[in-house]
From Swiss-Prot:
Chain positions of motif 'HIGH' region: 146-156
Entry's family note: Belongs to the class-I aminoacyl-tRNA synthetase family.
Keyword terms of this UniProt record: Aminoacyl-tRNA synthetase, ATP-binding, Ligase, Mitochondrion, Nucleotide-binding, Protein biosynthesis, Transit peptide
Origin organism lineage: Eukaryota, Metazoa, Chordata, Craniata, Vertebrata
Species: Sus scrofa (Pig)
Targeting signal (transit peptide) range: 1-15
Gene3D superfamilies (UniProt xref): HUPs, Isoleucyl-tRNA Synthetase, Domain 1, Valyl/Leucyl/Isoleucyl-tRNA synthetase, editing domain
Residues annotated as binding ATP: 662
Gene Ontology BP annotations: valyl-tRNA aminoacylation
InterPro entries linked: aa-tRNA-synth_I_CS, aa-tRNA-synth_Ia, Anticodon_Ia_Val, M/V/L/I-tRNA-synth_anticd-bd, Rossmann-like_a/b/a_fold, tRNAsynth_Ia_anticodon-bd, Val/Leu/Ile-tRNA-synth_edit, Valyl-tRNA_ligase
Name the record gives this protein: Valine--tRNA ligase, mitochondrial
Keyword ATP-binding: yes
């Protein structure tokens, strides 16, 4: 087939059905993130600090002055969708015998490949041992098991994109790779979602059902959502070994959880005690620290809470007087943000060195509500410079007060019940009232008694239960705890010794601080959904009137009965055992995942072969709550660290820098970005969710503002590439849909490049072996050098796990080296008859190697295009690009010529100068003559070697040389490349000065106004001075060019003959 320009090549289509893409229009954004350049640790930490400060400002609303980057209101032009409709059985290989569609269509590209990959077993470690490039090394990872609370969000997509890129790279290298899929039962989160669903659909509360009936409802939810999550992972291209899929509530996990609990108990690392815990009154359960959101308040704030008919005020400090016993006019004033806990006060504390209270040491005070006498105690923990320097002590409802009370032997009074109402210890006037209703009644009582001393705004941090939205209380409860100090010390030492590597390294500081201050871990939850605690209460021992309950632990009730018999000295058959109704914290079973997923506690082949894991990759927000606990329990239970390396990526935030939240309406479903979605559908998804009416209104409004035209179809590969292109090991990732769309255009560039290459190769092309390919022209040598350098950069990026380096290198090669330069330069060469043999071989190698380099990040596009390349002689090509060898830097280093690339960059400078001149003089079709002049020795030879590409890329005619020192030709436009080199472009006969000068003047006037405006205005707050200076320099340079162009045109006009002379 003769050569055709890229844009005009339209092969006949069979088996394709074009459809019109929806939605019809979409918003675009100009926001983009720099990526690819490593920064120093010090700069990275400083950047992290600034980002944290900025985020705090955003979330508390005090950064209103700074405007967030806005999505452009420009509508996105819909693209034609081409569907793959060739009959193909599920799991059969896709038919690639038909010509490529004329334009990239994600739905066509992504069809059929994944089921074939799975059926062929490419994702199984057993397959990889048979690969010709097999290294004998093992690489194992487990996916952070997503919660079965709903579908995956964009944060999960980031995790999958990073992990799958690493996994595919190791697999293509020839490593024996295992990537274990799984999902987490997410006790509190799932139970809360199902409870909301039951209330919304059937008007039922959980306790109106039996435990068994409720659990059946949860299992139904799990089956529905678990399948949806697995499908999403497949859509994202996650190359997981699905035959090893596990769930944290399946039979194997249950055995592992029970075994871990029993072993820890026998080792003295697990015990039952009455201690303060985080308590959600709405859920009536203890909750973990990660389920407590710290909400900063700058002052008085009204919040709506579960169970409260009216909003509740927070951020207020109430001052209360405690009269001194025996001195009618003396009192000690304390401030509190929680007057509802006043009935639980057992003392007032001051600092021993606070001179204001020295005379009251050892005295007693009257409780402002009951009149009971309370001691005034001294303790160095009190901060005398805060408020009045005196604090009330409520050991039953404050962790700090509990420690203080323990030091002074004070007995706690629990005045708030599990359901958030006041207990009988408060007296009849408060008993049974909601705690925040009681708050108002207490303040009124203080006013009536003349002991109220004021109310003022007070900045504070309010603990909120992320699952229920209720304010978290600290209650004294009998719970099961894991002793963490000894295990925590071992975890801290592992990082110090280098046995455990945290990347980025700045996370080591948080790690060491957390483990040096770690407390015991409350692992029991008052829920129905989860792993039932394998502990049993011996009823007979409680009946004896023992002050402490008698609990025994066993893998089964029979084992527990044997333990109870030995403990009590009574026959086991005579004992009554009641199993603890509580379940274990979800993080307990999640902490076992790296080894329970491989079969522990059984000694399975997978456990022996793949444990410890090679790498743990997850979000930085899970460093302490999940990673830390995996390290503690893994080391304790298996005798080994569960992994030696931890890679922590950043949080994904929206374009305004806000955390993704359903109530904000900014949560992005990866499928909506992949497939595109109309605004109406987005809004319907919100209405189908579990948001309350107030949250729904806020979320819908935000969604309408952010995506007025919906979301365009971008495809899986573009989404994955975007997520990996950010420097996710540093600051948070601010995702913009328009950025994903730009990488969809990049996919289209690659698509068109391969259509051009395949057309240029023709049907009879036979590729040379890669090692035999030798460039026959400087242009061929240059592109192969670029390809070799790209392989080096990709290898370095994967080895250091800085995927932004990989994406940057690939983007630069495909777009700027291959498409923008080499393909354009080689078109005239390919049009010659007969065609020289060199360029087609180079094109094939660029396509083959380039696609294999790209495959870990864009697996669908790479497979679709690579399958269409001609086979090398001997047909030894791998069946799929998934298992084809990844190009090594070493195998291509003979092509790498840094000096040639440096020299050609000089040619590119000349090309850019010529294009700029053409734009200035609006030479759209003409191909003017060009002269080059250089006084640098040897530089003329450099240009001579690339005269053909220079003429083609610069869109000019004949290219000649002007001797050094020779006068510039009259009326030719000139541009300087440096102090030693200039280019000249002929204008005579190509430009009409009388027509063009007014255009230049109008353009100059417009730019001068912009310059004047920039000089006159004051830079906005937060605007970088360098940005303002850069814009200023750009305008001044453009004005200088226009002035120069106008001068050339006037010279041209003066040199032109008058009508009378003709």
């Amino acid at each position: 087939m003769p050569h055709l320009p890229l844009a005009s090549f339209r092969p006949p289509l069979r088996g394709l059905r074009p459809t019109r893409c929806f939605p019809r229009s979409h918003s675009l954004s100009t926001q983009s993130e720099p990526h690819g350049s490593p920064i120093s640790r010090r700069n990275r930490e400083a950047k992290q600090k600034r980002l944290r400060e900025k985020q705090a400002a955003l979330e508390t609303g005090i950064a209103a002055k700074g405007k967030p980057p806005a999505e452009s209101t420009k509508a996105w032009t819909p693209k034609e969708i081409v569907l793959y409709e060739i009959p193909t059985e599920h799991g059969e290989k896709k038919d690639v015998s038909r010509p490529l569609p004329p334009a990239y269509s994600p739905r066509y590209v992504e069809a059929a490949w994944y089921p074939w990959w799975v059926r062929e077993g490419f994702f199984k470690p057993e397959y990889q041992t048979r690969l010709p490039q097999a290294t004998g090394e093992t690489f194992s990872m487990c996916i952070p098991p997503p919660n079965v609370t709903g579908s995956l969000h964009i944060g999960h997509a980031l995790t999958v994109a990073i992990q799958d890129a690493l996994v595919r790279w190791h697999r293509m290298r020839g490593d024996r790779v295992l990537w274990v899929p799984g999902s987490d039962h997410a006790g509190i989160a799932t139970q809360a979602v199902v409870e909301k669903k039951l209330w919304k659909e059937r008007g039922l509360r959980r306790r109106e059902l039996s435990r068994e009936d409720f659990l059946r409802e949860v299992w139904k939810w799990k089956e529905e959502k678990g399948g949806e999550i697995c499908q999403q992972l497949r859509v994202l291209g996650a190359s997981l070994d699905w035959d090893r899929e596990c769930f944290t509530m399946d039979a194997g996990s249950s055995v592992a959880v029970t075994e871990a609990f029993v072993r820890l108990y026998k080792a003295g690392l697990l015990y039952r005690s009455r201690q303060l815990v985080n308590w959600s009154c709405a859920l009536r359960s203890a909750i973990s620290d990660i389920e407590v959101e710290s909400r900063p308040l700058s002052g008085r704030t009204e919040l709506r809470l579960p169970g409260c008919p009216t909003p509740v005020s927070f951020g207020l400090l109430v001052s209360v007087a405690f009269p001194v016993d025996g001195e009618p006019d003396a009192e000690v004033v304390v401030g509190t943000t929680r007057p509802e806990t006043l009935p639980g006060d057992v003392a007032v504390a001051v600092h021993p060195d606070d001179a204001r209270y020295t005379h009251l040491h050892g005295r007693q005070l009257h409780h402002p509500l009951t009149g009971q006498l309370l001691p005034l105690i001294t303790d160095c923990a009190v901060q005398p410079h805060l408020g009045t320097g005196a604090v009330k002590v409520t050991p039953a409802h404050s962790p700090a007060d509990a420690e203080l009370g323990a030091r002074h032997g004070l007995s706690p009074l629990s005045v708030i019940a599990e359901d958030g109402t006041m207990t009988s210890l408060c007296g009849d006037w408060l008993q049974g009232l909601h705690r925040f209703v009681a708050r108002e009644k207490i303040v009124s009582a203080l006013r009536e008694r003349g002991l109220f001393r004021g109310l003022q705004n007070h900045p504070m941090v309010l603990p909120i239960c992320s699952r229920s939205g209720d304010v978290v209380e600290y209650l004294l409860k009998s719970q099961w705890f894991v002793r963490c100090q000894e295990m925590g010390e071992q975890a801290a030492k592992a990082v110090v010794s280098g046995a455990l590597e945290l990347s980025p390294s700045f996370h080591q500081k948080n790690w060491q601080h957390w483990f040096s201050h770690i407390g015991d871990w409350c692992v029991s939850r008052q829920l129905w959904w989860g792993h039932r605690i394998p502990a049993y209460l011996v009823v007979e021992e409680r009946a004896k009137g023992n002050t402490e309950d008698c609990w025994v632990v066993g893998r089964t009730e029979a084992e527990a009965r044997e333990v109870a018999a030995e403990l009590t000295g009574r026959p086991g058959a005579e004992l009554t055992l009641e199993r603890d109704p509580d379940v274990l914290d979800t993080w307990f079973s999640s902490a076992l995942f790296p080894f329970s997923a491989l079969g522990w506690p059984q000694e399975t082949p997978d456990l022996a072969r793949f444990y410890p894991l090679s790498l743990l990759e997850t979000g930085s927000d899970l460093l302490l709550f999940w990673v830390g606990r995996m390290v503690m329990l893994g080391t304790q239970l298996t005798g080994q660290l569960p992994f030696s390396k931890v890679l922590l990526h950043s949080m994904v935030r929206d374009r305004q820098g806000r955390k993704m939240s359903k109530s904000l309406g900014n949560v992005l479903d990866p499928r909506d970005i992949i497939n595109g979605v109309e605004l109406q559908v987005l809004q319907e998804k919100l209405r189908d969710g579990n948001l309350d009416p107030a949250e729904l209104a806020i979320a819908a409004a935000a969604q309408k503002k952010d995506f007025p035209h919906g979301i365009p179809e971008c495809g899986t590969d573009a989404l994955r590439f975007t997520l990996c292109s950010h420097g996710v090991l540093g600051g948070d990732l601010h995702l913009s849909v328009s950025e994903v769309l730009s990488f969809r255009h990049f996919c289209n560039k690659i698509w068109n490049a391969l259509r051009f290459i395949l057309n240029a190769l023709g049907e009879k092309f036979i590729p040379q072996p890669l090692e035999e390919l030798c460039p026959t022209s400087p242009m061929d040598a240059w592109i192969l050098s670029c390809l070799a350098r790209t392989a080096q950069e990709c290898e370095r990026g994967f080895l250091t796990r800085e995927l932004a380096l990989v994406t940057h290198a690939l983007h630069h090669f495909w777009l700027h080296n291959l498409c923008d330069v080499y393909l354009e330069a080689v078109k005239p060469v390919l049009s010659h008859s007969p065609r020289p043999p060199g360029p087609p071989q180079v094109l094939f190698s660029c396509a083959d190697v380039g696609l294999r380099l790209l495959a870990p990040l864009m697996p669908f596009l790479a497979e679709e295009l690579w399958q269409r390349l001609p086979l090398r002689p001997g047909n030894t090509t791998a069946p799929s690009i998934c298992v084809a060898p990844y190009p090594s830097a070493h195998s291509l280093e003979h092509w790498h010529q840094p000096e040639l690339e440096r020299r050609f960059s000089r040619v590119q400078e000349a090309v850019q100068a010529l294009r700029a001149l053409r734009a200035t003089y609006q030479l759209t079709k003409a191909r003017p003559r060009v002269l080059l002049q250089t006084s640098e020795p040897g530089e003329q030879g450099l240009f001579e070697a690339f005269l053909g590409p220079l003429s083609t890329l610069g869109h000019c005619g004949a290219v000649g040389f002007l001797p050094p020192g020779a006068a510039a030709p009259s009326s030719w436009a000139q541009a300087s490349l440096s102090d030693t080199a200039q280019v000249y472009m002929e204008l005579q006969g190509l430009v009409d000065p009388q027509t063009h000068l007014p255009r230049l003047a109008a353009r100059r006037q417009k730019l001068q106004k912009q310059l004047d405006s920039l000089l006159a205005r004051t830079p906005s707050e937060g605007e970088a001075e360098s940005q303002s200076q850069q814009r200023l320099s750009s305008l001044q340079l453009e004005l200088s060019k226009l002035d120069k162009a106008a001068s050339h045109l006037r010279q041209l006009m003066d040199a032109s003959p008058s009508p009378g002379e003709l």
